[in-house]
A protein has these predicted regions:
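C-terminal structural segments of small proteins and small subunits
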Residues: 57-92
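N-terminal first-folded block
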Residues: 2-29
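Amphipathic, hydrophobic secondary-structure cores in small proteins
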Residues: 12, 27-55
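Short connector loops at helix/strand junctions that flank enzyme active sites
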Residues: 2, 39-41, 66
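Short amphipathic alpha-helices in soluble, non-transmembrane regions
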Residues: 18-23, 54-64
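Ordered hydrophobic segments in well-structured contexts
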Residues: 4-8, 43-45, 70-73
Length: 92
């Protein structure tokens, strides 16, 4: 089972600035998975154990509006390849 949180962005600039902002939370920048559609094609992957600290940093320091990004919870079954992807409320 592979579980993670994902931020997708409307612009490459927003993706790169968020990745730099969340660097202390050990996030990973990656292409947006095929099962999600996002404009710029870049996403930031957050491990479940780093979710709370990532959200706190993002909430306190990000200048993005809720129109600039989308937030997802992803669970992928490695054996079957099945993916469960739920869009979450924006980080507030």
């Amino acid at each position: 089972m592979d579980e993670y949180y994902l931020l997708t962005f409307e612009s490459t600039h927003a993706a790169i600035s968020t990745e730099k902002l969340l660097k202390p939370a050990e996030v990973t920048i990656m292409p947006v998975p095929r099962f999600i559609s996002a404009s710029c094609g870049i996403s930031v992957r957050i491990r479940p154990d780093m979710r709370e600290s990532s959200e706190n940093i993002f909430r306190e320091s990000s200048k993005l509006t809720t129109d600039d990004y989308s937030y997802y919870h992803v669970i992928r079954d490695r054996a079957s390849g099945d993916v469960q992807c739920n869009k979450l409320e924006p980080i507030k």
